[in-house]
Amino acid sequence: MALTLEPGVTVEAGRYTALVSPPGFLVDVLLQPEVDRFETLYCYGVGSRVLGRLPRQAPRLALQSCMTVHQLLASLREAHQSIVIVEYDDGIFSPLEGDDRDVIFAVGRTLRELAREAAVLLWAPRGDRGLRALLLLADQVVWHYDERPAGSVAPARRRRHEVQVTLADAV
């Protein structure tokens, strides 16, 4: 059982994979026939950027909303499905500071342990500080972007202006 992300890049049991991509790319992954053939758990935070984009004949997913990191940890520890997909929600990870940041690493360790028995995919639309901590423990990290985001175009270099001169020197 494997989900194909790109030619030569698969999500399979025994491997914890992190995917950073636009939501539409994950929708395409979720529409693969393998998702319907195997029990699939989809964990998301307060809201999902992906679930609303699925068509009406969406695959069968066991959905689990996790409002806190601790709820996410509990859901992952109880997971028995063949495929586990976690939608990263920066809203539940960003408030963690100081000693609470250890909880992020606990999530990463739990995802890695779960990958021994299931295909585990962590998805995020972009990287941030909390996600970087989760990426450290991933077996493979896939960044998938077809186009450059609109704001990523480098601004044109400005010409150097001549040194200012006083009015007396200009005349």
Question: What are the language-model segments listed below?
Answer:
Residues 1-171:
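N-terminal regions of ATP-driven nucleic-acid and macromolecular assemblies
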